[in-house]
């Protein structure tokens, strides 16, 4: 598709994040359909877009900017594309996601945070 998948930025735009053990995350560079860049300005625009995405993701996670770019541009993971596929705990190990867990784990975490906030407001 055009530009960039929104999945990772959405997943990390939180205070806490979970991924189920079998879920995958595709870390890839900004791209468009086709293989041509028609003008230098297009290349520059794509670099700017990618830099904004990388900055957003790295500022909302524990992954370093250089490591994220390395995963995005990996050539050895997929036969006909650039990028890296991370499965469950690999996303946590890389620092993109905070925890491996399911919906129940996320709900329990949220309930705990609500209780902590209530207690803090009582003081």
Segment roles from a protein language model:
Residues 1-123:
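N-terminal organellar transit peptides
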């Amino acid at each position: 598709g055009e530009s960039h998948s929104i999945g990772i930025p959405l997943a990390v735009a939180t205070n806490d994040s979970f991924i189920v053990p079998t879920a995958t995350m595709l870390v890839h560079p900004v791209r468009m359909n086709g293989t041509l860049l028609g003008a230098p300005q297009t290349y520059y625009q794509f670099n700017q877009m990618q830099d904004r995405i990388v900055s957003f993701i790295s500022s909302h996670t524990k992954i370093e900017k250089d490591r994220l770019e390395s995963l995005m541009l990996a050539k050895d993971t997929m036969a006909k594309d650039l990028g890296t596929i991370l499965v469950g705990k690999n996303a946590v190990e890389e620092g993109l996601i905070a925890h491996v867990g399911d919906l129940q784990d996320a709900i329990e975490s949220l309930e705990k945070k609500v209780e902590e906030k209530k207690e803090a407001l009582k003081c």
